[in-house]
Amino acid sequence: MDKSKRTFLKSKRSFRKRLPPIQSGDRIDYKNMSLISRFISEQGKILSRRVNRLTLKQQRLITIAIKQARILSLLPFLNNEKQFERTESTTRTPSLRARKR
């Protein structure tokens, strides 16, 4: 009986508590671009609470600050920079269609 119970026990893993993304001294403000830019994706979207690991109140304040910065044109609404450029056209040619048949 003891051996069968032992096989189902999981070993306790040690885990490190992550630091909160916003420290107590950080001020959430639309002018604080270094803080705001951490919570925006590469496309310029506001990241979710799950991704940011923020509390509801912090996420609300970050969202308001980002929107104010966008309105005052400190932040772009969209990030239109193309990171990947196509070198060849991807249109289908008749020769490719003939090969597949």
UniProtKB/Swiss-Prot annotation:
UniProt keyword list: Chloroplast, Plastid, Ribonucleoprotein, Ribosomal protein, RNA-binding, rRNA-binding
UniProt record similarity statement: Belongs to the bacterial ribosomal protein bS18 family.
Listed PROSITE patterns: RIBOSOMAL_S18 (PS00057)
Superkingdom of the organism of origin: Eukaryota
Compartment annotation: Plastid, Chloroplast
MF GO annotations: rRNA binding; structural constituent of ribosome
Keyword Ribonucleoprotein appears in the UniProt entry: yes
Protein name (database record): Small ribosomal subunit protein bS18c
GO terms under cellular component: chloroplast; ribonucleoprotein complex; ribosome
Keyword Glycoprotein tagged: no
Origin species: Helianthus annuus (Common sunflower)
InterPro entries given in the database record: Ribosomal_bS18, Ribosomal_bS18_CS, Ribosomal_bS18_sf
PANTHER family hit by this protein: 30S RIBOSOMAL PROTEIN S18, SMALL RIBOSOMAL SUBUNIT PROTEIN BS18M
GO biological process, one term: translation
Pfam families tied to this protein: Ribosomal_S18
Gene3D superfamilies to which the protein is assigned, alphabetical: Ribosomal protein S18
Subunit-structure text: Part of the 30S ribosomal subunit.
